[in-house]
């Protein structure tokens, strides 16, 4: 049984993660945190999530509960996640990272930390999305050289980064399968007279509206036919359940940088 700490416990994902841990037979909720200015500091986390009294109060820093947990699950902001990574390094803890929007220096810090502690990091913890990543690799190898490739993603109005981490992950899967780096072929905006589409580019389109949980489509379009691979999430619990699954898998693993491909053993497919 893995003892889990939830960072950002009062957020949309934090609350779902608490429910996912509560419903898991492999994990137990051991700690929870919120930012220091939160009015929920000191509140019972189970009551906050509508699950009844848990005996675990929300703290403003997981360092205050460091002896109580084995793994942190962190879906917060880059600055908070990097702080929790440092805590894990200091105390030999593991961390599951669902935070997106890291700068290049931030990514480098994560890579360095993975030499000391076990880390799972993924743009999306849905099992279905990670199956889609694998399908995209195969489609790109077969169709990529003669198709136009576009990625369309849609999320709720409150999402603060664009394109989504999942859309970037889809682009990386496709570009990598074709022997390219996404940074070299990605086109994130089109406006005005852009000229004809270049051969290898991967286009991105972003929608922010209403309460859309998450929708992603990769389009492989040729003259006369088009293949679309789509994933639609209707409940954030799918991400939360995947992250809890990853925390159980990561517990007692050797230091290293892992992804959901490793958790789900997708490279064997």
Curated annotation (Swiss-Prot):
PANTHER family for the chain: 4-HYDROXY-TETRAHYDRODIPICOLINATE REDUCTASE 1, CHLOROPLASTIC-RELATED, DIHYDRODIPICOLINATE REDUCTASE
Family matches, as NCBIfam families: dapB (TIGR00036)
Annotated catalysed reactions: (S)-2,3,4,5-tetrahydrodipicolinate + NAD(+) + H2O = (2S,4S)-4-hydroxy-2,3,4,5-tetrahydrodipicolinate + NADH + H(+); (S)-2,3,4,5-tetrahydrodipicolinate + NADP(+) + H2O = (2S,4S)-4-hydroxy-2,3,4,5-tetrahydrodipicolinate + NADPH + H(+)
Enzyme class, broadest EC rank: oxidoreductase
Molecular function GO labels: 4-hydroxy-tetrahydrodipicolinate reductase; NAD binding; NADP binding; oxidoreductase activity, acting on CH or CH2 groups, NAD or NADP as acceptor
Binding positions for NAD(+) per the UniProt entry: 8-13, 34, 98-100, 122-125
Main location: cytoplasm
Gene3D superfamilies xrefs: Dihydrodipicolinate Reductase, domain 2 (3.30.360.10), NAD(P)-binding Rossmann-like Domain (3.40.50.720)
Chain sites annotated for binding (S)-2,3,4,5-tetrahydrodipicolinate: 156, 165-166
Keyword annotations: Amino-acid biosynthesis, Cytoplasm, Diaminopimelate biosynthesis, Lysine biosynthesis, NAD, NADP, Oxidoreductase
Source organism: Aliivibrio salmonicida (strain LFI1238) (Vibrio salmonicida (strain LFI1238))
Location in the cell: Cytoplasm
Protein name: 4-hydroxy-tetrahydrodipicolinate reductase
Annotated catalytic residues: 155, 159
Annotated pathway: Amino-acid biosynthesis; L-lysine biosynthesis via DAP pathway; (S)-tetrahydrodipicolinate from L-aspartate: step 4/4
GO CC list: cytosol
Task of the protein: Catalyzes the conversion of 4-hydroxy-tetrahydrodipicolinate (HTPA) to tetrahydrodipicolinate.
Pfam families xrefs: DapB_C, DapB_N
